[in-house]
Amino acid sequence: MRAIWLLAVLWLAGCQHVAVAPPPAGEILDLRNGQVLTAQQLLMRLAEPERVIVGEQHDNADHHSVQLWLLQALDEQRPQGSLLLEMLTPEQQSKVDQVRRAATPPADLPEALAWQDGWDWNLYGPIVRFALTQPYPLLAANLDTAEIHTFYRNPPVLKGERSNAAPVKSTLLEQISDSHCGLLTESQMPAMLAVQQQRDRRMAERLLAAPTPSLLLAGAWHARKDVGVPVHVLDLGAPEAPTVLMLAEQGSEMTAAMADYVWFTAVTPKQDYCEQMRKQFGK
């Protein structure tokens, strides 16, 4: 009983003021003019727009440390309106809301949220735990599994001039092929592209509907200004695209067409995802 009481105290304590730790290390650039920024200068710039997207490398722990710092530090600049996660689906939203309303935290938070195994809880857990103690909503931004299967089998017509531009589609097709290690057949590519763009469209819709100032955390390709969610935000009629901060490892190619700002972090050891994928494909 005492353990449960202590958990409740800690849970409620999260609703109070959080002392923001120093920012994680890294080199920050304004890609529009090449200016080197301090973390505080970046913070001031990100506090102004209504909508911000932060692109990540999913398995990079430094990126999630930066995201948590940004979430906490931005709230010091102005009240946060909402946080959206690519890692949450619509079918999880009611579970998220239920946990937020609870007087005490669940004994097993990932289980209570039906957290998907594909997203490493050790990396995302601190962000989710913090967000659940705050007054603003934590919102799902992705598609449900059933929707993905539907879009794969019957790709819908995507409306919008920018998202249908040939350079956008060709760039995404190349990325899809590379990320699947060249194991996809040509016949699979249109359906895979449709799913990717429907994910981007959903995130754009959710971002536009969310209370502002809003922050979306998503994979780098979803975040990109030239091919990802920002393109769909404009196709949906928004007067301006969201501001994009890309988190990237040192040495990564990053241009002003891709993002407004970049926060370079240390290079991490690469996992051989292609080897894992070849085993799944039996090749």
Where in the sequence are the language-model features?
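Bacterial N-terminal signal peptides
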Residues: 3-14
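Compositional signal for N-terminal targeting/processing segments
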Residues: 15-283
